[in-house]
A protein has these predicted regions:
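Membrane-embedded alpha-helices of multi-pass transport/permease systems
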Residues: 174-191
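Juxtamembrane inter-helical linkers in multi-pass membrane proteins
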Residues: 137-151, 186-200, 257
Length: 285
């Protein structure tokens, strides 16, 4: 059951918005059962390493649901929340994958730097392409965001929608790139004594990145199917479709994620040379 509230604005025009959604059906039992089945399958077929990676996954989900989303709704700076999520997640994932070693520090540093650069570049590109970040899913719930009213009686926007879109894209890019970063650092650490350690590392990572993209790209592009159907249903022309704000924002998000995954290898290999080699040289001395 969707509860709809009806009101009038200052000009007397009637408007309606959904205020809450009630469901007479209890689904939690089935969802809990599916969670248990999923955990059992991970334990059986992914083994110890799979169970170990459930720790950061559960931590991250808890941070996003219990901390990030409520804080965003209350008006907390979205970029600060993004930084906190990426920082905590990178520490947890890198330490679990690489241990408490110099390699982990390198991987954490690379992930933080790449996320910062990602945000700056995406903001810049959006400004050049006149994209506001209003994606389909953001448009769907914007009506439910209650604006704040300050002491002067003026309405303030409760959330920066553009920043929200970039934060979502940055989180997706981070989780797509962090396995690539950790694996690149691990491989470079094994090859650092060779003459062409960086080149050898990049060459060995090419197949891994290709497999990663084959998995990620089709999955991401399926997300734009509802938006594309919406434009087709509204009989938009080809020019209107390719210039659509809703579709364009999603495509830009996907392409930036792909770029992050691809660039994670050379950036990680070069950062690994600067830091791992220094630690290696210090041990020799």
């Amino acid at each position: 059951v969707i509860n709809v509230s009806i009101g009038t604005n200052d000009e007397g025009n009637i408007y309606a918005y959904s205020s809450s959604i009630d469901s007479p059906v209890s689904r939690w039992g089935w969802i809990a059962l599916l969670i248990v089945v999923t955990l059992l399958l991970v334990a059986v077929f992914a083994g110890k390493s799979g169970m170990k990676m459930l720790v950061p996954i559960l931590l991250i989900v808890d941070l996003i649901i219990m901390v990030m989303v409520p804080a965003m709704y209350s008006g907390t700076n979205i970029m600060l929340l993004l930084g906190a999520i990426v920082w905590l997640s990178s520490i947890t994932i890198c330490v679990l994958k690489l241990g408490v070693r110099t390699k982990s520090f390198v991987a954490i540093l690379v992930s933080l730097v790449m996320t910062f650069v990602f945000v700056i570049l995406m903001y810049g590109f959006d400004n050049l392409a006149y994209l506001s970040g209003i994606t389909y899913e953001i448009t769907s719930f914007v009506e439910s965001i209650i604006p704040r009213i300050n002491t002067a009686g003026e309405i303030e926007i409760a959330m920066d929608v553009h920043a929200l879109n970039i934060a979502i894209a940055a989180i997706m890019a981070f989780f797509a790139a962090i396995p690539v970063i950790c694996k690149t650092i691990q491989i470079y650490d094994e090859k650092k004594d060779g003459e062409n350690a960086i080149k050898d590392t990049i060459d060995e990572m090419k197949e891994y990145v290709s497999d990663k993209l084959v998995t990620i790209v089709p999955m991401l592009f399926t997300l734009i199917i509802p938006k594309y159907l919406l434009l087709i249903i509204n009989k938009c022309s080809f020019a209107e479709i390719i210039n659509s704000e809703v579709l364009g924002s999603d495509i830009v998000r996907i392409l930036f994620i792909v770029i992050s995954v691809v660039l994670a290898v050379p950036i990680s290999a070069n950062m690994g040379k600067l830091l791992i080699d220094d630690a290696h040289s210090a041990r020799k001395e």
